Amino acid sequence: MLVLTLSSEVNGFTYDKNSHNFMLTHPNLEIESDCSEYAINSSNYRFWEPPIQKYIKECNEGLQGSREKNFNMRWCGSMVADIHRILMRGGIFIYPKDNKLPQRAGRLRLMYEANPMALIIENAGGRASTGREPILEIN
């Protein structure tokens, strides 16, 4: 699927092998507001800041926890694939700052990873932030 955003509209196109064209198959994509999926590399839990640890702990507690809802973790190690799933089904993608390599805090590259995905997510009705500021407002 090819995803294109212009202005505030996000559209998905699928390649048609017969016509050799990309056909509009998912017009006006909007992120589902009520979803119980999150994407995070939980193997780095011990390196995260306490607020992220708390949020993931609460998600993992499910119905018995303070969020009173069962959540599913999805992580495939590809931001593009995770963002595609979020566009199709809703959810949250989390790539938190950690203290594993303090000199490299935040490993998503702003110009060709974070900004393009943030623009798509924001235009589809979602939010994209560092946890402290909107990604699209970073200079």
Where are these regions (language model features)?
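IMPase-like, lithium-sensitive Mg2+-dependent phosphomonoesterase catalytic core
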Residues: 1-139
